[in-house]
Curated annotation (Swiss-Prot):
Signal peptide as annotated in the record: 1-24
PANTHER family per record: C-C MOTIF CHEMOKINE 5, SMALL INDUCIBLE CYTOKINE A
Keyword annotations of the record: Chemotaxis, Cytokine, Disulfide bond, Inflammatory response, Secreted, Signal
Localization (cell): Secreted
Disulfide bonds: 34-58, 35-74
Name recorded for this polypeptide: C-C motif chemokine 5
InterPro entries: Chemokine_b/g/d (IPR039809), Chemokine_CC_CS (IPR000827), Chemokine_IL8-like_dom (IPR001811), Interleukin_8-like_sf (IPR036048)
Any single biological process term in GO: positive regulation of T cell chemotaxis
Length: 92
């Protein structure tokens, strides 16, 4: 079975995005995490179970997605895919 180069590249990019998430870090004594970088690619929506916004004490506003494996991943709230995922999670 032959796989196209585009399909192979897509699989590699998705795997790389999942293997190198941008973790959320707690801010001082506050247990609410802050984000210092955003995930560059969209997560597969099926991997996301919930989300929350970072605290106003954080220097960067971010959405933190919690995956099915309980990993916290930072995302840019201005990105279209992030807004779509939030809407999807709110509706389900």
């Amino acid at each position: 079975m032959k796989i196209s180069a585009a399909a192979s590249l897509t699989v590699i990019l998705v795997a790389a995005a999942l293997c190198t998430p941008v973790p959320a870090s707690p801010y001082g004594s506050d247990t609410t995490p802050c984000c210092f970088a955003y995930l560059s690619l969209a997560l597969p929506r099926a991997h996301v179970k919930e989300y929350f916004y970072t605290s106003s004490k954080c220097s960067n506003l971010a959405v933190v997605f919690v995956t099915r494996r309980n990993r916290q991943v930072c995302a840019n709230p201005e990105k279209k895919w992030v807004q779509e995922y939030i809407n999807y999670l709110e509706m389900s």
